[in-house]
Amino acid sequence: MAGLGLALAGCGVQAQQPLPGGAATAGQDGLGARARARGIGFGTAVQGALLASDPAYAAAVMLEAQLLVPEFEAKWDALQPREGEFDFAPLDMVIDFARARRKQLRGHALVWHQAMPPWLPEALAEGPARARRVLEAHLDKVLGTTRGVISDWDVVNEPLANPSGSRFAALTPARGIFRETPWLRALGPDYIELALRLARQRDATLRLTINDYGLEADTPWAEQKRQAMLSLVRRLQAARCPLDAVGLQAHLQMDEPFRPEPLAKFIGTLRSLGLAVLITELDVREGRSLPAGLAARDVLVAGYVEAVVGTALAAGCRTVLCWGLSDRHSWLLRDPDVARRDDQQHRGHPLDMAFRRKPMWQALARAFAGR
């Protein structure tokens, strides 16, 4: 791949090796165990309904992941579909699964411009006092209920604007470095600081994270967004606002070039500011043109992943989460904004449709081993 900055042929990526019987089985070391042996946390986004209904899905999660994040169940529309009426039953499915199997949990996401129930934008439009009351009530209930169970939250998700030139810029209005959202309109840029302070007041044990995408590639707009994130972090720190970590979503796009140096420098700067750095939503969208055959495609995906994750780990990142383990239930297939428009499907996860390990699995294992 032009511009990758690393020779994929030298990454040690091999063609797919299906495991006996197809899916991964309990006698084999999963990615979570391999990562943990090196002081790294590895996990995945999960869906509670699938954990309960799909035995192969649940088995893969049990084997491969040590850290789980609810894909949908902790978002605002799931937890508070009507004002003042909370529903924790879907989230409890994930919590119960994790507790029974001694998995750690992180939460996603307390403040976001998507996954809003219909009443929420209307309430925020009533003004800053109403917006603050709504936010306080939500954090009171959610953090009070999950205290001691979820120790790490994406408190604010995707606050930054997409810089001019990026493929998403036209879709996302901006106000300076910030994405224009109902939260920004109601409370101004200080909504970020407010959310972090309120979260810390409600649970002093939490790791408070700001999470965003488009921070990994070697493009002018990714560099602009990296600088915007650093500007936001410094602004918060100057205000003595609590912040513990920055999440890099790492929804990687293979049409974008990658070079290790810009990402390593960015992570190093965040670490020098006293923050942890996490990869929170790793998956891969393949390029517009595809090589013939799944094996060749999977090798390219694996090489890109190994380059990015290896760079991040070497720079001090110690947590890696995939946004799903398997291609079978991937948002890359069901979301029209990211699904392929040809007759192909993205193969951007460590396991295939039958939960067999792909070269991306091997690439992650190698990155965790530091090879």
Model-derived features with residue positions:
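Substrate-binding cleft and catalytic face of glycoside hydrolase catalytic domains
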Residues: 67-81, 90-215, 286
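Boundary/entry segment of secreted carbohydrate-active catalytic domains
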Residues: 21-64, 71
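Short, acidic/polar
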Residues: 49-63, 133-142, 223-236, 303-309
